[in-house]
Design a protein with these regions (language model features):
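Structural and coupling elements of P-loop NTPases
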Residues: 1-185
């Protein structure tokens, strides 16, 4: 009920019910970023007096199975047996980072550590540059914006847009407890 009220007032907030063996019943929520997530969390705690358990953000991957069908994977438990998987695909975003020229090297290093592939570099004047990288969304959603702000002393900006899905070198890892496959914590 509290989530529905928030969704009515904030069309950018999405949620759907989900059940986990490890955590029980809950909701998978979609936000515009970490700040948006923190605001929603505070509103739920303050207005609805709800204690929340928050898990790390994740992204939707695609799998092409042996029959050539493309399947969206929202959680690790949905990954089919390895024998049924032809190819894993990860979401890629194009990141435009505007930085003071003094911090170009630090930002490039950070983007490369996040598996980014540089697309362009353009000087916007004597003091600023825009660096464009294609980076896996999983490397962006958690803290890339904060890291860019940190390594540019608050002067860097980041915006990104979805490019599509690209092949990824991934595999399924099962966690077994007492011989039974369980959800990852």
């Amino acid at each position: 009920d509290a989530l529905e009220r928030l969704a009515v007032n904030d069309p950018s907030f999405e949620f759907e019910p989900e059940t986990s063996d490890a955590l029980g019943f809950g909701f998978r929520c979609g936000f515009l970023g970490l700040l948006h997530m923190e605001i929603i969390q505070q509103r739920l705690e303050n207005e609805a007096d709800i204690d929340l358990v928050q898990t790390a953000p994740n992204v939707t991957y695609e799998i092409v199975n042996k029959r050539g069908e493309t399947i969206s994977i929202h959680k690790p438990q949905d990954v089919p047996d390895p024998g049924d998987v032809e190819e894993f695909r990860q979401p890629i975003v194009r990141c435009n980072v505007i930085v003071p020229t003094d911090f170009i090297g630090a930002v490039m290093k950070l983007c490369q550590e996040r598996r980014g592939i540089q697309q362009s570099q353009e000087y916007l004047g004597a003091q600023r540059a825009m660096i464009t990288y294609d980076i896996p969304l999983a490397e962006v959603v958690y803290d890339l914006h904060d890291k860019i702000k940190s390594c540019t002393r608050g002067y860097g900006t980041l915006d990104y847009e979805m490019v599509g899905y690209e092949p990824a070198d991934l595999c399924r890892l099962d966690i077994m407890v007492n011989g039974k496959r369980v959800d990852a914590l």
